[in-house]
Every structure is written in C-alpha cells, then in structure tokens.
Amino acid sequence: MPFHKNHLMYALLLVISLSIIIPVLFNGGALRDRLSEKTAKALVLSCIDFRFVNDKVSFFNSIGFRDDYNKFSLAGASLGYNQTQFPEWRETCNKHIELAMQLHDINEVIVMDHMDCGAYRILYDSPSMSRQEEYELHKKNLNKFKTMINQKFPALTVTTHLMDVDGSVMS
C-alpha cells in the first residue's frame, strides 16, 4: 500500500487528540484539576460597559484574583443594585450572591464602578453631569451598596472600587 500524506496527517491528529483526551479522562492534567475546584474568592459586580473589560481583568489579575472569581454585571454596577426603577436587578444580584456562596464558597463581594458611566447619566437623568458630580454619586452608591450587602450577607466582606476612564483604579 503506498504512503499518502493523508495517512501522516490522520496519525498526527490522532496522537494530538489522544495526548489531550487521555490526561483528562484519567484525572490528570491541569484542566481536570481546574474543573474539580469548587471555591472562588469572590463575586465581582461590575458595569456592563464593554470599554472596561480588559482593564477590569488586568486589575483583578494584579490583585491575585486571576480565574478565581464569579462575574456578574449590572448597568451602573452599584447604581444598578441601588436604583428603584428596576427592583428585579437587586433581587437577581442577591440570588447570584447566594448561589456563589453555595456553589463556590465565596467570602467576598467586590463591586467595581467606573467613571463616564452611561447608566449614571440615564438613571439620574443628567446627560451633562460634571466629573465631580459623577464621582460623588459613585461614592454614595458604592457606600450604599456596601451597607446593603453587609446587612443582607453579614458573613461576606464587601470591597468597593472605582475605575477611571484610563483604566486606573481610583479607590
């Protein structure tokens, strides 16, 4: 039987596939170990704004949370939780916190707001609020969020952060 390039390609694919599948099937390899972990450090609540995704990941990696937190998003983050126009947002967030406690044994809730937040302009009906006005509203909402979560989930630590438009964390 003559040798074909296809035989070599199939053999190579088989070897590569088996080298990936066998360790997973026999409880070896990093993937199996990672999938068996049942804990996470925290649930992180942040805004839905796509502009800050990479900056948030970089920040959480830098403080030791790489691949070690549950992610939850609400428009406005702390404001999304505190506002009254959509009360189901708060209840949904609370249910996710409860679930993260049960599934992943979290011991912390972290909320990260960001400056230049469209949800703040819309929910406060203030399209031209100043940077200082927005900053003060963030601080107010972050503090209110912390108080409310501490009351509802006293066993959890609550940490608040505010990201600036350049990706730096202000607090």
Model segments located where?
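Short Gly/aromatic-enriched secondary-structure transition segments
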Residues: 57-64
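A short beta-strand-loop structural module common to alpha/beta enzyme folds
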Residues: 67-77
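N-terminal secretory signal peptides that target proteins for export/translocation
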Residues: 1-3
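Divalent-metal-activated hydrolytic enzyme cores
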Residues: 6-56, 75-92, 99-104, 108, ...
